[in-house]
Every structure is written in structure tokens, then in C-alpha cells.
Amino acid sequence: MMNYINSILTSSNANNTTYKWLVSIAFIYAGVKLVNNVKTPFTIAEGFNQSKPYVYKKDENVYDDFMSEIYDELYETNSRTDWELAQIIRLTSPDTNNSVFLDLGSGTGQCVNMLKNNGYRVYGVDKSQNMVKYAENKYPNIDIISANINDSMTFERSSFTHILCTKMTIYQFKNKKLFFNNCYRWMIPNGYLILHLVDRKRFNLIKPKHVDELKWTPLVQPKKKRCTSIVSEYEDFKYKANYTFPVNLEETNIVCFNESFTDKVTNHVRDNEQTLFMENITDIINMAKQVGFIFHAKVDMGDIGDDNQYLYILERPH
């Protein structure tokens, strides 16, 4: 049988083209099925190990040692960061001699490390000391600090050509006017501010990609339903996440992001709750323009599966 299949694949006969295509498809399908059978449930490097029956973390306290360990795999930051940086470099043309990057909410330091490895001067800042400690241990050669981004004196005036605020970090700032003022102060003229913004009425929760989600892609995509909650299973714990939107979103702009982790052995539970301040995109851009920023570019993040999410690139003109 294998000799017959090999003869089809290696044949130069044009009449065998269709057979070659069908055999190739069959091999791909078999490979997908094999991966599905072997690799589920999804594995995260560090397991869930919690001695207390119940732990509740809110806002800045969410990012402790546990979250630092699982953050990159849980939110798939590697592929997203790689794609985002490719867009930023394509649209702003930085150079390794003169460009200086600042990553706001630098988390585990992955973005800072990628830029540094590509020859750029780059600094990171995060409010979580646990995240900074994790980043320093993982990437000893990067420059990253724990500081308050709301403090205008955190960095000197006109220090950066690029300020990145990705991973929906901007929604953690209640006073966005202050945020934009600080960024404007820290940037040089003709510098760029990169924001990850979402259509708050249409965006989906970022879902961890499990291997069992691999499937044939139809030629005509069905209309997608909005996903604001997920239930997912990992090697050591069950994971649930959801966004809670108020009825009067236009008036309050306050959205809650909740996560729950349940140990599969002990049934111990950890709950995270984060308060997000989600003005609509137009209002956020208008606040930036009032400070002095101008629009430079916009990139749709649908290419990486994040529908109704965008990278906005703003410029400080002078």
C-alpha cells in the first residue's frame, strides 16, 4: 500500500495530479487527528498549586507569581507580540541607531526582549513587581522597572521615539487624559504612540488555542457569534473567563473581566477580577487629539483572530 501511495506522489504523470492532491489532503487530515488525540488537554508549563481553598485577587493584585508563570501561554503572547511588532516596524520604520522604545505594561518582558534581540534600545515598565521580577529572571539583559505610569516624573521629557501600549493595557487607566499627557511628555517630536483598542460592543474574549480546535476551514466562513465568556481545560486546572458589561455602558464605561481557576485535584479555586475603563474608540482618540497627537495608521487585528480589535498608531507632530 505504501509503495502504491509513494508511486502516486512521485509520479510525473499529469493524470495523477488529482490523486496527489487527495493523498496529500488525507495525510494532513490524519496528522491533525493524531495531534488532537495526543495533545489534549492543553498543557501549561507551570501547574496550579494553591494551598488555600479559595483565593480572590483584584486589579493590580492579580499579577502575582502564579499569573506571571502562566501569563504568556494562557494569553498566547508570543505569536501576538511577534505580529504586532512586525506591523509597528512596517508602519513606523524605526532604526537601531536612533529609535528608543518604551513598553507600557511590559508584563513578562517578552516584547522588550524581542526588540532588544533585534538591536533596538528598549525599556519596559509595569506596575506589578512580581511581573518585573519574573521578566528580569527570564531575560536578565533587558531593562525593565516597576513604576507608576500615572506619575509624569517616571521618565524624563523627550526620551522615546516609540511608546507601546498593547494587550488592552490602556483600559486599565481611568484617567486617560493624564495617560496621554504623560506619553506626550515622554516622547520626542515625530514619535509614535501605539495603542491596542477594541470595539467594546463587538470584540471577542481572547481564547486560548487548544490543539483540538484544529479543523478544516470552510471556503465560506459562517457568521461568528460574539464570545465574551469561555470555559477551558488545562493539564492541572479548569479555566473560566468572562467580560461583564453594565446595562448603561455608555454612561459608566466600566467593564469587569473575571477569571476563575479550579484545581483538578483539590478543587481549590482562585478568582481574578479586573476593572476596565472602556470608553468607545472615538472618545479615546479624541482625548489623544486634544493633547496634541495626530492619527498615523490603523491595523485590523483580525489577521491573528482578534476580530474588532485594532492597533492605532498616533504621532506626536512637534
Regions found by a protein language model. Name each.
Residues 21, 27, 32-96, 98-107, 110:
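Conserved class I S-adenosyl-L-methionine
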Residues 109-152:
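Class I SAM-dependent methyltransferase SAM/SAH-binding core
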Residues 154-162:
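A short acidic, Gly/Pro-enriched loop at the edge of an enzyme's catalytic core
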Residues 161-175:
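A short SAM/SAH-binding and catalytic strip from SAM-dependent methyltransferases
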Residues 177-189:
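A short glycine-rich, Lys/Arg-flanked "PGG" loop and its adjoining helix->strand segment in the class I
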Residues 190-197:
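Conserved beta-strand signature within the Rossmann-like core of class I S-adenosyl-L-methionine
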Residues 197-285:
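SAM-dependent methyltransferase
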